[in-house]
Amino acid sequence: MTHSAFRSGLLLALLIGVPFAVGSSPPPPDALLKTMQRELERATRSLGKSDPAPYFLSYAAEDRDAVTIVAVNGSLVASESARRRQADVMLRVGTPGLDNTHGASRPSGITSGMLPLENNPDATAHVLWQLTNREYEQAAGAFLRVKTNEAVRSQEEDQSPDFSQEAAKIELGGTVLPFSLDQKAWEDRLRRISAGFLKYPDVYTSLVLLQGGTARSYLATSEGAAIVEPSTIVRLVIEGETRADDGMDLLRVETFQAASASQLPSESELMAKVDKIGTDLKALRSAPPADPYIGPALLSGRAAAVFFHEVLGHRLEGHRQRDEREGQTFTKKVNQQVLPSFLTVVDDPTLQELSGVKLAGHYDFDDEGVPAERVEAVENGVLKNFLMSRMPITNFNHSNGHGRRQAGLMPTGRQGNLIVTSTNTVKDSELRARFIEEIKKQAKPYGLYFEDIQGGFTLTTRALPQAFQVIPVMVWRVYADGRPDELVRGVDIVGTPLLSLNNIILTGDTEQVFNGVCGAESGQVPVAAVAPAMLFSEIEVQKRAKGTQRPPLLPPPGLKTAPSPTHTADPGGVGR
């Protein structure tokens, strides 16, 4: 089963899995690379005499120090830094036409291990030698099985090679400005911000998390590629959770991303977000559960962005077009209409920010050493391209810089910054009026406005329904007769892609950004999705699964008296 999830910093574990670095000054960027290149050359010469001989060998390394500060209810629960160096050895035996990574044997192409923290050439080379030997044995055995399977199984429909030929790039990276973080000051700041949840006794679980620094990724290949890519990033997450009387867990999360800690929102702005989360959760606890519904719906820009990431984006990933276990929804629809003609979809990892918001899916080179490219996937509703790694598919023979992975896993075609634009727009202030017109036109008592979204997932394999599920958190019934909007809870957007994507009839004129972490076969990678608010003629929702545990019987100890704030719509919101 292919299961792809898109989350916005919901769990500490997710954030720790994203590469960051800080602390002591990193070693010169060429020192580790030179050791990798020397051992790569030695291994290539030696293994070239083996049978079967490798035709490709690469060493990748990631050097990072992670600084993480977590505060809960006014007190620190973690403030730590940890240095880590990991190496991945990727090796292919056979030929580019057929090698050990073919089909289900793809994991045989990689072996991983930890590198010494010190820049000791001998110790580093020894680890690479061990990993290379282990990987060669794994790859050679897998290639034998691949050849056996080819002889006894029916011919595959897509006869593309297993590996594309790409120009080897040399890029030793620019100089990253030293990462500056006053850890003591941020510890105090997170204490104060997290203490804001004490005013909300119904928020049973909360945290404020800061993580950031600089990282260096290294790649050396037998083709001659040599890449050192530095990066700097900071993330701050505010999370609160409560439970309704019927056992339904309710979560609200706000995530902020910047190039430096100084670019994060001010303390007063972050305190306001805590109050917003606390107020929202209080309102959600008393909101009625939603009923199954099919009818008009309005999605905010953030909600529409996640919708497109799940429903369209994963089905544009190149490897899904040749894997015969996949549903291949769009494989044979190139140059056909797949979206309304007013919509265009690009994936552009070269963009660092949009409208002043840093995009999480930015990178200069993908994890196979191919320069990132802007890919126009859908032009005026017509499918034009897929997101390609170095795994070719029919009529798409080369990578377009979208081979991505989490350390320890083989790369596949993945999304970076997925951006949806529209030529059929109205002012956001007018979109609500058009929404109500559509509700009346269909003689529905109400429509649903999806204000904010938590994440989602999609199923892409043939063995399961070609379906998706998007998980909203702030959903409103908008009544056609003018009654006040009503907050509801426990609703998920569900459906199938081909039908749902063509129910869009109008969009707003302001794009919104959703930054998150996406999980698929090649692991968790940071991504962004961008879209305007969208009006759908029809969307289907279902009731969300809930637990059976009641809220805590014992009141929380010693919390401040909670205020009774009144929920108001966000200024500039399109739905209310």
Map each language-model feature to its residues:
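Active-site bordering "gate/hinge" segments
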Residues: 20-365, 370-374, 379-382, 395, ...
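Bacterial N-terminal signal peptides that target proteins for export
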Residues: 1-10
